[in-house]
Design a protein with these regions (language model features):
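Extracellular/lumenal glycan-associated context and N-glycosylation machinery
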Residues: 1-338
Length: 338
């Protein structure tokens, strides 16, 4: 029988699975619910594998074999992956998520560590590992099959359209990245330094994210994010050159920074020609606002302005990115049309 600590870990995993199922019931979108259920299934398998070790002697080797079979299935699915569609934007969004789920199975370098102190926990972790691969493969197939079932019989491939657009956008991103000005080394303003570092790091990695994408659909999404990041950097540079300090002294200044971020996100949703293309980027911007809100909520009483740097960076970065979204989406659509 497992000792108290191990029994607690198995119980906690089962409880975690139950909690994630409940969260899935009230998730704001089906994709969020799907991710919650993936988490729930992995936690449930962790607990089940641990108890199976006790009840019937489930071995690590059996789970390794099961994982190898799943990877083999994933390779077969990957070799048959066809980018059928009638609209490259919609196709890229669905296939992109399927690509990422599939890539998580095929390119997962994590392997559960063999615990000499507890073979039971090793088996439990392998159960989690196996189930994570299984549900991601199943969900990739589900999204793929569900989307293709909506297509007309004469739907053609959008693979070339996506790949050509990605190459055009990659060249654009490379050109823009080369044009990034050198970051100043004599600015001792911590707020400006943090903001510049946050925006610049995203801009500099823009091409890498496209190159590392598991397929053309994800690459298009990464190119859209990259363009947004580079345009946001341009906006930041312009504001810094105009003498903007981004500093705050009063609660009203903080409120104005937050309002600007929320308004920018709302405006981007209205102004972007294909909202679905940029919604993930704007969702990230909204999360930045939420993170800043949580940080502010933790303060109590009088607060020194320097302690507001983190939320102000979050609000300002969200504003810069959201305001850059419409132009980025226009550039992506132009690339798809050529």
């Amino acid at each position: 029988m497992p000792n108290g600590y191990i029994r607690q870990r198995l119980t906690e995993a089962a409880e975690e699975a139950t909690d994630r199922v409940e969260e899935a019931r009230t998730a704001p979108s089906r994709l969020v619910a799907l991710n919650k259920l993936q988490w729930a299934q992995s936690e449930a398998r962790y607990a089940a594998a641990g108890w199976a070790f006790v009840d019937r002697g489930l071995a690590e080797a059996e789970l390794r074999s099961e994982h190898q079979a799943i990877v083999s299935e994933a390779n077969s699915f990957d070799s048959e992956f066809a980018y059928l569609g009638t609209d490259p934007i919609t196709a890229s969004l669905v296939y992109g998520q399927a690509e990422r789920f599939l890539d998580s199975v095929l390119d997962d370098g994590r392997t559960p560590t063999s615990r000499k102190s507890s073979q039971l926990l090793t088996v439990a972790e392998w159960g989690d590992h196996v189930e994570t691969a299984r549900v991601q493969l199943d969900d990739a197939r589900y999204l793929y099959d569900r989307y293709q079932s909506t297509l007309p019989d004469d739907a053609g491939s959008v693979a070339d359209t996506l790949s050509t657009a990605v190459e055009t956008l990659r060249s654009d991103l490379q050109h823009r990245r080369k044009g990034l000005p050198e970051a100043p080394t004599d600015d001792d303003n911590r707020l400006r330094w943090r903001l510049r570092d946050d925006i610049r790091s995203n801009a500099e990695s823009s091409v890498d994210r496209v190159d590392e994408a598991p397929g053309p659909a994800t690459a298009l999404s990464m190119a859209t994010r990259g363009l947004t990041a580079l345009l946001a950097h341009d906006r930041l540079t312009d504001r810094l050159e105009d003498g903007e300090t981004f500093g705050v002294e009063t609660a009203a200044d903080v409120r104005d920074a937050r309002t600007a971020a929320v308004d920018a996100i709302t405006a981007a949703l209205d102004e972007s020609p294909r909202t679905a293309l940029v919604r993930p980027i704007l969702a990230d911007a909204a999360r930045s606002v939420s993170f800043a809100d949580d940080r502010l909520a933790a303060f109590d009483g009088d607060v020194r302005p320097s302690r507001l740097d983190h939320p102000i960076v979050e609000y300002t970065a969200a504003t810069l990115r959201a305001r850059s979204v419409p132009a980025a989406s226009e550039t992506v659509l132009d690339a798809l049309d050529t």
